[in-house]
Each structure stands twice: as structure tokens, then as C-alpha cells.
UniProtKB/Swiss-Prot annotation:
HAMAP family in the record: UPF0283
Subcellular location: Cell inner membrane
Listed Basic and acidic residues bias regions: 1-19
InterPro entries with a match to the protein in the record: DUF697 (IPR021147), UPF0283 (IPR006507)
Pfam family, any one: DUF697
Major localization class: membrane
Topological region Periplasmic: 1-69, 121-212
Protein name (database record): UPF0283 membrane protein YcjF
Amino acid sequence: MSEPLKPRIDFAEPLKEEPTSAFKAQQTFSEAESHTFAPAAIDERPEDEGVAEAAVDAALRPKRSLWRKMVMGGLALFGASVVGQGVQWTMNAWQTQDWVALGGCAAGALIVGAGVGSVVTEWWRLWRLRQRAHERDEARELLHSHSVVKGRAFCEKLAQQAGIDQSHPALQRWYAAIHETQNDREIVGLYAHLVQPVLDAQARREISRFAAESTLMIAVSPLALVDMAFIAWRNLRLINRIATLYGIELGYYSRLRLFRLVLLNIAFAGASELVREVGMDWMSQDLAARLSTRAAQGIGAGLLTARLGIKAMELCRPLPWADNDKPRLGDFRRQLIGQLKETLQKSKSSPEK
């Protein structure tokens, strides 16, 4: 028998691609492997929080307007005129031997010198606060860099700014872990895992202490005015303590600027997270039914203080947050509730005795 004829093949038309199946191949897992599965981490951050963070960054950038330049130029011209007039008065008083006027000129020079010195000091501290944001950006770049140029010097500068002595155990472990073949990303990563947690742990303890004090003070104090003054004073002290831990010396204007940055950051980016975390805890545990109104207000004040401390910690920290390193309100919430319940139980048991 003759073989059947084959169909015609037309090479003028393009080749047709065979459709591929969208299904993945079957995978079989053993019973032992099934116990090692972990649920996928779901990012609970709302979608609009990224937009809020961008709005914060745009709001915190200094705006160099024409009016500001004109005001600064006018102040510089006025200062030069005052100095020139003072020099002229001093020369005239010396030539005429007017010792009273000469003493007044000397006193004025001392006052002006003290004012200029304080302005320069405030400017330097404010500049250091602004430089911390640039250092954080530089650290973020180094954590993605494969060069071997600036990593070690950058980390040593951070340790010196934070007041960490060369004989500190954490710094000694970091020196022992690094070697010449490591790149900047590995060196800065080792610093972030070995040295930076020492400062972060101290900052967390300060936040816990100040938040607990705010909670207990609001819970037991009957005067709202005293509560407001106490909370404002303790929050400023908390910001100063955190800035000092991270090697930033705050002046008057730099303290106001940091406080403003923290409040702006909370207002833009922290409202949704605060409402979500506090609301979930209060609704799930029904704290309003268990605790008194003053106790609930104390917990709210303590959580706001903790939120303030977390944001101050984020702005003063020289390194960006790594995975799961950023403190959350939940870390402090359970501690505050436990301390408040313990205090209330002690106060109830003391009259019975």
C-alpha cells in the first residue's frame, strides 16, 4: 500500500506559537515539610499612607523663597551697620577720652558677641539636625552599594557621634566581624545588626518609661490643666533624651524644629496606624468596660507619648529601619495595659488592708 500524502506546508506564513498552559506543575510536600510552612506576611499599611509619607517629605523640605532671601539680606546689612556704628562710637570715645561712653561700648560689644555666639551655636545645632536626614540617605545608599570605599569610615563616624567608646563590646564585635573583602553594604549591615541595636534598646526603654509615667499620671490626676502641662513637659523631655542618645545636641530652635517634624509626621502618616492599632486593641479586649474613664484616658495619653517617641526615634536615627526593626505601638500597648491594671489592683487592695 502507498503511504498517505502529507499536508502542505506553507513557509510564507509566520509560525504559530503553541499555547502554553497557565497552570503550574503539581508539587507534592511531605507531612514533615507541612509543619514548617508560615503564613505570608500581609502588609497592613493602608495604601494612602505612602502618599501621606510623600506629603510629609515635601512639607519638611526647606523652601528657599525670594522673601526669605530678602529678609536674610536685610538682617545681614543691619548687623553690619550695627558693627560699623559701634566701631565708630568706640573710636570717638577713645579719641575724646569719654570713659563712660567707652564702657558702654564695651558692654554693648559683650552683649552683641554673646548674641552672635548663641546664634552661631543654634545654627550649628540646627544644621546637625538637618544633616542627620542626609546621613540617613547616605546610609540607605551604602546599604545597596557594592563598593569598598566609605562603609567603615561612615560607621566609625556614627559611633563617634553617638558617644560609643572604642572599647564598647558591641563595637569590638563589629570590628571583629568585618574584614577587607567585605563591601559597604555588608559593613553597614553588620553595624546595623551589632552596634545600632544598643542605642535602639536604650531609646525603647526611655519611650516605655515616659509612656508609663504619662499613663499613670493621667489615670490618677483629677486636674486636666495639670495633665496637659505634665504631658507637654514629659514629651519635650522625651525628645531631648532620644536626641541625646543618638548624638544630636538640641538647641532652642532645633528642639522646636524637631518637635514640629514629629508632630507633622504623626499628623500625616501616623493617624491611620494609630486609629487601627488602638481601635483593634480596645474593641477586642473591651477596655472601656473593664477600666474607668480616667484609666482609658491614661492609656490614650501613654500611647500618644509612645507614638511621639517612636517618631522622634525615627527622625534622630542615623540608619534607616531594617525589616521588623521598627518599634510598633503594640510593643508598648500591652506593657502600658499591664502596668495600669497592676496599679489599679494595688490601689483597690490598699484601702481593704
